[in-house]
C-alpha cells in the first residue's frame, strides 16, 4: 500500500504525490460531495506523519475525521476512494468498521484526546510499546471535552503527541480566547524572527537540537517577554511550533525529534484550509463540506431559518440567535448580517450555547439556539437541567433532523424526538413543509413561554424566499386530517409526510405538526373511525413519536391495531437520502407494503 511506498520516496516524489492526492480529492469531492477544504489542508501533514509513525503499530487518531481523506488513501483505500460517501462505499469519516487502521471512530469534534488517553493507558497496562498521536484542529480544540482531556495529560503522565492543525477555522471562523491565543502564537513577527535566529545559531553547533533543548530557558524567556504565558505549557505540556504544515521535510524532522519524548507534547502546525484549490482557499467555509458540483441551486431549510428569523427580528427586538461554530451551516449567517448585535457564535460549545440561551430567556429575551440534531445531543444535561427544569423560554432550532444522507451514522438526526419526549415542559414541533416551517417559527416566537424544539431536515427544495415569507402567519400548532379513507389511518410527523401522501391506498392521512403535546382531539376522532392506526416518523422507532401515540391510545382504552413505523434498532449507514429511505422502508413504496400487510391480515382473519 502507499503507506509503505512513501517511506522510500524522495522529497520531490512526495511533493508530486501530494499534488496527485490533492487532484484526486478535489475531483472526487466535487463529484460526490464531501469535506474538501479541510482535507486539502492536511495532505503534506499526513505524508510527513506517516513517514515517521505507522498506523499499523501506533494509535493515530483523527479528531472529527473530516480531514482524514489522505489517511484513507495511504492506508489501502486508494482504489475505493471514488466511492467515498456513496451508498455502500467508503465513509466520509473515520470508522473502525472500515479499517483496523482507523483506530477510533469519529464524526463529532473534540473526542480525540480523551480517546488517545484511553488507548495509551490500555497499551501501558498490556505492556505494549506503541506511540499515541492525535491530530486535532484548532476549532475542535475549543470544545469542552478536548479541553477537559488536555487538562489530564500531565496528571496521568501521558506521553501523547498532539498535532494541532491550525487553520484558523472550524466550519466558520474560530472565535474565543483560545483562537486569539493561537493567532498570537502563529503571527507574532518578533517571536518568529527571534526563534528563527536562535534556531539557526543552535543548528550550526555540533550538538544542535540538544543544545536548543538545554537552552529552553532562553527560548521560553523570549516567548514570555513577547507573548506572555503559553496556554499549553501552563498545563504542563511541551509546546513546539508553529511550523509550516505544508513543508513535508520540515515536519518529518520535527516528528522524528519528538517521537520518543516521554512527556506530553503539542506540535503546532499551521495549514491553509483548501490548499491548492483557489476557490476553497478563498472561501473555506463554503467548501468545508462541498455538495456535488452539478447539483442545481436550491433553497435549504437552514437558509429559510436565517431569512425567517431575520424578518421576524426586525419587529421583535428580543429575538437573539445562538450557534456552535455553525453560522453558515445553520443559516444564521443570514441573521448575523442583518442583526450582528443579536447573533452569538460560541464555537464548538453546545453545552455552553444551551445554558447561555437559558439565561437570556430567563431575563426577557427570546433565544433561538440553532444546532444540528446530532450535535444537540451533546448538551442533553443542559437541556434538562438548565432549560426545562426552569421552564426557560428557549427555541431549539434542530437542524438536519432525520436521515441526512452521505455524512452517515455520526450525523443522522434520528434521536432528537426520543431524547426530548420525556423532558417535562418541552414542546416538540415537526413541520412537513417550508410554508409550515416558517409559520410555525412565527407562531412560536409570538408566544415563547417555555422550551420549544422545532425539528427540520437537511433537505433542499425549489422555492422563492419572498413568496414563502409573504404567506407567513400565525397557525394552529395541532394536527390536521389531510384526507380521509376507510382502510386505515396514518399519522405522520415531519417531512416524511410527503412520502405518506404518495401511498395509493384508501387511507386517512393525518399531519401531526406537534409531536408533543399530542393533539388528543384529533387522535380520539381517528381512533373512533379506524381499527388500524399506523404512525410514521423519520426517527428511531423505539421510544419515539409512535410509542407516545400508542401509550395514549392504550390509556384511552382503544382496542385496535397500532403499528409504529420508524428507524429500527440500528445505526443507519451513509448514502443518498432516497437510497436510505428505500432501505429503511420509509419511502412511499416501502410504506405502501407495510400498510398493505396489516390491511390484508385483517381481511384474512376477519379482525385486526
From Swiss-Prot:
A GO cellular-component term linked to this record: cytosol
GO biological process: 1-deoxy-D-xylulose 5-phosphate biosynthetic process; isopentenyl diphosphate biosynthetic process, methylerythritol 4-phosphate pathway; terpenoid biosynthetic process; thiamine biosynthetic process
Alphabetical list of InterPro entries matching this protein: Dxylulose-5-P_synthase, THDP-binding, Transketo_C/PFOR_II, Transketolase-like_Pyr-bd, Transketolase_C, Transketolase_CS
Pathway named in the protein's UniProt entry: Metabolic intermediate biosynthesis; 1-deoxy-D-xylulose 5-phosphate biosynthesis; 1-deoxy-D-xylulose 5-phosphate from D-glyceraldehyde 3-phosphate and pyruvate: step 1/1
Keyword Transferase attributed: yes
UniProt-listed Enzyme Commission number(s): 2.2.1.7
Gene Ontology MF terms in the entry: 1-deoxy-D-xylulose-5-phosphate synthase activity; magnesium ion binding; thiamine pyrophosphate binding
Enzyme class: transferase
Binding site for Mg(2+): 138, 167
Binding locations of thiamine diphosphate: 66, 107-109, 139-140, 167, 277, 350
Membrane spanning stretches: none
Cofactor(s) for this UniProt protein: Mg(2+); thiamine diphosphate
Keywords: Isoprene biosynthesis, Magnesium, Metal-binding, Thiamine biosynthesis, Thiamine pyrophosphate, Transferase
Catalysis: reaction(s): D-glyceraldehyde 3-phosphate + pyruvate + H(+) = 1-deoxy-D-xylulose 5-phosphate + CO2
Function in brief: Catalyzes the acyloin condensation reaction between C atoms 2 and 3 of pyruvate and glyceraldehyde 3-phosphate to yield 1-deoxy-D-xylulose-5-phosphate (DXP).
Cross-referenced NCBIfam families: dxs, PRK05444.2-2
HAMAP family in the cross-refs: DXP_synth
Similarity annotation: Belongs to the transketolase family. DXPS subfamily.
Subunit and partners: Homodimer.
Annotated protein name in UniProt: 1-deoxy-D-xylulose-5-phosphate synthase
Source species of the chain: Thermotoga petrophila (strain ATCC BAA-488 / DSM 13995 / JCM 10881 / RKU-1)
